Amino acid sequence: MARRRKGRPINGVILLDKPTGISSNDALQKVKRIYFAEKAGHTGALDPLATGMLPICLGEATKFSQFLLDSDKRYRVIAKLGERTNTSDSDGEVVETRPVDVTLEKLEACIEKFRGESDQVPSMFSALKYQGKPLYEYARKGIEVPRESRKITVYEIILHRFEGDEVEMEVHCSKGTYIRTIVDDLGEMLGCGAHVTMLRRTAVAKYPYEKMVTLEQLNELLEQAHREEIAPRELLDPLLMPMDTAVEDLPEVNLIPELADMVQHGQPVQVLGAPEQGFLRLTMGEEHLFIGVGEMNDDGKIAPKRLVVFRDEE
């Protein structure tokens, strides 16, 4: 006897405005329950302190979350000068206090040094894993473990405000960039120490800021549906972005139904005019129905990599 599935096969991406004080996984589980979704996954964790854009993939969209993990991000951050903490943010304990003797000219010169490509060593208080455990589990026990530096790129870093011991900046960066580490490094450059007091992610890939929704808004829609005695999906589902928005930057290859059927059965196909390499966004027919992601193989054919499984709600 087939096991009954828990949740419904809803597909799409919800742009959650994560509140401060909860983990990204807690936020994910709340959204999953609200949507009664069968599957859900986020696309790059935010610290509990942080707020802002947390794209949550539902259903088949989870197959394409890696492409959002790899995308550029934008942040707004406020740093407090003069205090260094063990987590590089205000959730941690102050481990060092130093006087702040910083001029605007010195601050601008130090900030400019972060622009471009560099090597960054991740914080011990991060979710990266070492021997199967998150680094923060070691850090909480006072254990320091080796971490490899990673190539990151800061495309843009803008100073918006410098008042007293507070610095407010905007950062546009590549995947895997730790803003806490940038702030900690900035504090050391300035000779006074620093830590993050506010962090807000304002953009992931090309998703529009104005499409974000809060947990409160989702819960209000849920309550409204119960009051009006309608299915919650009627109010909740229109908020979802199409799942192919996760891969909208990939070149599109539109397949005729016969070739699409071959791809959906795992067979590589030859398509005239297709790019010579890389991942491809595969669509089918005149409606350009998204069916998944393929990759050019060594034979010059499109091989299926991640395919959408279409299922109706029961």
From Swiss-Prot:
Catalytic activity entry: uridine(55) in tRNA = pseudouridine(55) in tRNA
Active site: D47 (nucleophile)
InterPro entries to which the protein is assigned, alphabetical: PsdUridine_synth_cat_dom_sf (IPR020103), PsdUridine_synth_N (IPR002501), PUA-like_sf (IPR015947), PUA_sf (IPR036974), tRNA_psdUridine_synth_TruB (IPR014780), tRNA_sdUridine_synth_fam1_C (IPR015240), TruB_C (IPR032819)
Gene Ontology biological process: mRNA pseudouridine synthesis; tRNA pseudouridine synthesis
Pfam families with a match to the protein in the record: TruB-C_2, TruB_C_2, TruB_N
Taxonomic superkingdom: Bacteria
EC number: 5.4.99.25
Keyword tags: Isomerase, tRNA processing
Enzyme class, UniProt record, top EC level: isomerase
GO molecular function annotations of the record: RNA binding; tRNA pseudouridine(55) synthase activity
Family per record: Belongs to the pseudouridine synthase TruB family. Type 1 subfamily.
Main function: Responsible for synthesis of pseudouridine from uracil-55 in the psi GC loop of transfer RNAs.
PANTHER family for the chain: PSEUDOURIDYLATE SYNTHASE TRUB1 (PTHR13767:SF2), TRNA-PSEUDOURIDINE SYNTHASE (PTHR13767)
Designated name of the protein: tRNA pseudouridine synthase B
Source organism per UniProt: Vibrio parahaemolyticus serotype O3:K6 (strain RIMD 2210633)
